[in-house]
């Protein structure tokens, strides 16, 4: 009965701190379940009856979840494809967001996992930015293929929303946030890896606590997970990031890596990739311009393509 605890909804503690938190958590979960069941599931069902897709914030019942990191995680877990987000949008400035200034931001979001950009129709000067739009289109073409390679699933309880930005995976690994709904659907017996309804494989499950992340032993202080047979997906220098897509074809697998230079200077780097199994490495030397990007495409036929999307679009 919630009536005796109505003051809790106004922030007034009752009985004890633990009891107060229990009631608050119950209220939050009830609201969450009602919003999902009574609104989103109903709205999505009505939309499907009219053959209309739904796009909104990251609720796992929509066709195109639209909110940064949670959207990416939910899209990966529930096999929603592609992952879209509104980009290059702001309330300040007077038409001074030149493509040269926006490209590092765009690359950063591509590396995070966004692979379809939504532009406000009255903000971006599309006609004056044809090359920029072509660059984004080419990147989206490659990054919408296959499925993302993400090694780590982090269980993030709904009652700790402010903690979602505090996770830092070891370098060379990507992670997704997993809520209770996804965790309950995790099928541990289906595969040695954790396989979810969207066929997304995770090799590590991290369960958060208020002051630590628990993985095998706590706190986990190693630089990587090699001792558990999971080497870094990519080894890169500082101030670089990546996205990795796995494409399974009739002729075998294809690994698409998107690498970005986040420094305003030209760099010569060595990138080491984990391909096929975690014990097979591919080492590639690359020359990246300031804020440059490159696709490295590897196949199990020992083929390798290096594609610089910006250079391909030069007149």
For every predicted segment, state its role.
Residues 1-315:
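Carbohydrate-binding surfaces of carbohydrate-active enzymes
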